[in-house]
Amino acid sequence: MALVQSRTFPHLNTPLSPILSSLHAPSSLFIRREIRPVAAPFSSSTAGNLPFSPLTRPRKLLCPPPRGKFVREDYLVKKLSAQELQELVKGDRKVPLIVDFYATWCGPCILMAQELEMLAVEYESNAIIVKVDTDDEYEFARDMQVRGLPTLFFISPDPSKDAIRTEGLIPLQMMHDIIDNEM
């Protein structure tokens, strides 16, 4: 139990409440406060099951924290390895191939992934859209001279046409124009 002493101001001659008026001397005002440790449902500290401070309220987890990199299986834009991508580029295709070089920690890459998902819905069977994680495929990204993220490669099914490369977040309309007019 902790006792906290509070002094009253000398200019206050009239009591503020019936409780304060029952006190004999203004300087004898004591506020009693009990401080009890709160039991936490989990603890991340190695010092035991006590929270960081006796006044700290425990947090409740709404869902488990994410563990590692996670790519959903129901995404239309599939993650490929370097070897799978090279086989796809060398194979026969009738539709353009869009390759997204991204990183999971990159904010613009996350925004680009949303736009590419919308693009994959619109060009369902008229384009193949894949992505490559530059953290997992570092050497391949270096060989492809990926300097900024996100980097997109638009590869035409016609081998005589050069690939179109973009760096940074580009609007959805620009991707439409490249696929419709340049491929």
From Swiss-Prot:
All copies of domain Thioredoxin, residue ranges: 82-183
PROSITE patterns per UniProt: THIOREDOXIN_2
Residues of the transit peptide: 1-81
Biological process according to GO: cell redox homeostasis; plastid organization
Family label: Belongs to the thioredoxin family. Plant CITRX-type subfamily.
Residues flagged as site, Deprotonates C-terminal active site Cys: D100
UniProt-listed Pfam families: Thioredoxin
Effect annotated for changing C109S: Does not affect the interaction with FLN1 or FLN2
Cited function: Thiol-disulfide oxidoreductase that plays a role in proper chloroplast development, most likely through regulating plastid-encoded polymerase (PEP) dependent chloroplast transcription. Acts as a component of the transcriptionally active plastid chromosome that is required for plastid gene expression.
Positions of the catalytic residues: C106, C109
Localization per Swiss-Prot or TrEMBL: Plastid, Chloroplast
Annotated site, Contributes to redox potential value, chain positions: G107, P108
Major location category of this protein: plastid
Disruption phenotype: Albino seedlings leading to lethality. Abnormal plastids lacking internal membrane structures.
Oligomeric and partner information: Interacts with FLN1 and FLN2. Interacts with MRL7.
Name recorded for this polypeptide: Thioredoxin-like protein CITRX, chloroplastic
Protein EC: 1.8.-.-
Top class in the EC scheme: oxidoreductase
Gene Ontology molecular function, alphabetical: protein-disulfide reductase [NAD(P)H] activity; protein-disulfide reductase activity
GO CC, any one term: thylakoid
Bridged cysteine pairs (disulfide): C106-C109
Keyword line: Chloroplast, Disulfide bond, Electron transport, Oxidoreductase, Plastid, Redox-active center, Transit peptide, Transport
Annotated organism of origin: Arabidopsis thaliana
InterPro entries, per the entry: CITRX, Thioredoxin-like_sf, Thioredoxin_domain
